[in-house]
Amino acid sequence: MTVFDIYIAFVSWGSGGKNRPVLILEESADSATVFNITSQYESKSDEIRTKYFVINDWRQAGLDRLSYVDTNNTVTLPLTSIDRKNPIGRLTAADEMRLLKFIDQ
């Protein structure tokens, strides 16, 4: 796994969780730091939307619909929760550069 790769991971919260696409930021021996990727935008508050980065090249990234990187929080996941054998894809170079600028704002 490398930075800006996209994988499916089981992301848990409280007593639940679901499989979702995640953007790899960093990998260690037993965990990875990621941003969640979501297609849910319209239902979010204006405040939350300001932290959502639109993936312009979502098809090239291997996603099946317009999606957003949730830069609100990073999530640290155990590597066992990530389907590392089957990466979805990765951000294009253009989206990588845009994301870095977005985060630096």
Tell me what each language-model feature is:
Residues M1-S12:
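Short coil-to-beta transition motif at edge beta-strands of beta-rich domains
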Residues T2, E27, D46-I48, G62-D64, ...:
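A generic structural signal for short, non-catalytic loop/turn and secondary-structure boundary residues
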Residues V3, G17, V34, S39, ...:
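Intrinsically disordered, low-complexity peptide-like regions
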Residues A9, S15-N19, I24-D57:
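Compact nucleic-acid interaction/catalytic patches
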Residues I55-Q105:
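C-terminal terminal-subdomain/extension
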